[in-house]
From Swiss-Prot:
Quaternary structure, from the entry: Component of the DSC E3 ubiquitin ligase complex composed of dsc1, dsc2, dsc3 and dsc4.
TM region positions: 22-42, 62-82, 84-104, 115-135
PANTHER family referenced in this protein's UniProt entry, alphabetically: DSC E3 UBIQUITIN LIGASE COMPLEX SUBUNIT 4
Compartmental location: Endoplasmic reticulum membrane; Golgi apparatus membrane
Protein name: DSC E3 ubiquitin ligase complex subunit 4
Biased composition range(s): Basic and acidic residues: 168-183
Keyword annotations from UniProtKB, A to Z: Endoplasmic reticulum, Golgi apparatus, Membrane, Transmembrane, Transmembrane helix, Ubl conjugation pathway
Residues covered by region (Disordered): 145-183, 256-281
Biased composition (Polar residues): 145-154
Superkingdom per UniProt: Eukaryota
Taxonomy of the source species: Eukaryota, Fungi, Dikarya, Ascomycota, Taphrinomycotina
Pathway given in the UniProt record: Protein modification; protein ubiquitination
UniProt record, GO biological process: protein ubiquitination; SREBP signaling pathway
Length: 281
């Protein structure tokens, strides 16, 4: 079960990273058509600050919608009220960049619709990434709150000692057990990756054969769907849209528990560090 959870989070991260690279590609393409350095720096700053995947929680107190909307409105005003870029006769009608050198020239655009359409596509893609970011960070936070409430009820109903009376020896024992669980999980993942690499290497070496005792698949045949993990599904509901426009309650909760969740010795039900579960992307 832990392996499937890690595989699903890896798929979400890969998908989110692909969307991030697509946004940077659109920004670069816009700069090739309109070599304005200020617009380039503004778009890269917004994308890098709010949407690019990072190893820590990206939900801030400020909603993600307003920086993205401000970026789009500034670009729209520049397209509407300023002249289009022009290339001189010496450059044969091609733009080769401004302060940043472009070795491959772009044909001079004669219509503002192309620029506005490109800005609109970038804005919609960034909104989609923000919704995925909010929805993916909301599920682990809700699960952690449910787990904390259940543990609190068990501590009240049971005969456990108060937290003030826990000795240092018991804390050291719990930390040692958590380290052993984490080490066991890492060993299992390492063994699984080594086995997968060995199987891939064997298939690559015997790919030209029609079959082998260990691999009966033809070189271009896909494996069955049962051999893969269940595809991850992120649902975006009306609450996610509200969190996109208004202040997200999960941003405050993640900020308050950031120091606890970043600890590799924090306990959880899967044996994976809470920093991985709290920040899936």
């Amino acid at each position: 079960m832990d392996t499937i959870v890690l595989d699903q989070r890896g798929e979400v991260f890969s998908f989110f990273r692909s969307l991030d690279m697509l946004c940077y590609a659109i920004i670069a393409q816009q700069y090739f058509q309109d070599p304005t350095v200020l617009l380039l720096l503004l778009k890269v700053f917004v994308q890098l600050s709010y949407l690019t995947p990072k190893p820590f929680s990206q939900l801030n107190a400020l909603p993600l919608f307003y920086p993205l909307l401000l970026n789009f409105l500034i670009s729209l005003m520049v397209r509407m009220f300023f002249n289009l870029p022009t290339a001189g006769e010496s450059l044969d009608g091609y733009l080769y960049g401004g302060s940043i050198i472009n070795f491959i020239g772009e044909k001079n655009e004669s219509s503002r619709i192309d620029f506005i359409t490109s800005d609109l596509v970038l804005f919609c893609l960034q909104i989609f990434m923000a919704l995925i970011l909010i929805a993916s960070n909301k599920r682990p936070t809700q699960a952690s709150h449910i787990q904390a409430s259940q543990s609190g009820l068990s501590n009240v109903d049971g005969d456990e000692e108060p937290s003030d009376l826990i000795t240092e020896d018991s804390r050291d024992t719990q930390q040692g057990q958590r380290q052993e669980d984490l080490q066991r999980q890492l060993e299992n993942e390492r063994s699984r990756l080594i086995a997968r690499f060995s199987h891939s290497l064997y298939s690559f070496q015997h790919g030209l054969s029609f079959g082998s005792p260990q691999n009966r698949n033809t070189p271009l045949q896909r494996q069955s769907a049962d051999s893969y993990s269940t595809p991850v599904c992120i649902e975006v509901d009306s609450e996610d849209w509200k969190d996109l426009v208004w202040k997200s309650q999960y941003a405050t909760e993640n900020a308050n528990t950031n120091s606890i969740n970043n600890s590799p010795l924090s306990s959880n039900t899967t044996g994976v560090p809470n920093s991985v579960l709290t920040n899936p992307i």
